Amino acid sequence: MTNSIYSTTMISNGGRDGRVFSPDNTFVQSLATPKEMGGQGGNDTNPEQLFAAGYSACFNSALSLILSQNKISDANPEVEITIELLKDDTDNGFKLGADIKVTLENMSQQDAEKFVEQAHQFCPYSKATRGNIDVQLDVTAQ
């Protein structure tokens, strides 16, 4: 990949009941299958939570950049992303779905929707998932 700005590596072992870590051990996290999927659950995370965390942080960063470019500094963007593991009837496997809820302050609903859509077009996670997972955008202006 020729235009790389940043890269990171994560290693997993043990699948959903294992762990994930970076080679330099700055990130080490145990994994657990959720109870809803027949696992033990508990305080450990899972791939869906990790994906939701990364996507929400990335989307919020993209939105903050769009707002900054439009000289808006008081919107206090909050991005909540829910990732669902869904049955995939096409191959009897699984697929992901995403519900992106964004709250912006001090602007009209119309402006909020415009900026969120711009962020959705710009966000690297949105670009990576576009056409691959169902995404629902829900925008609230306060």
From Swiss-Prot:
GO terms for biological process: response to oxidative stress. InterPro entries: KH_dom-like_a/b, OHR, OsmC/Ohr_fam, OsmC/Ohrsf. It holds the Pfam family OsmC. It comes from the Bacteria. PANTHER family: ORGANIC HYDROPEROXIDE RESISTANCE PROTEIN-LIKE. Belongs to the OsmC/Ohr family. This is Organic hydroperoxide resistance protein-like 2.
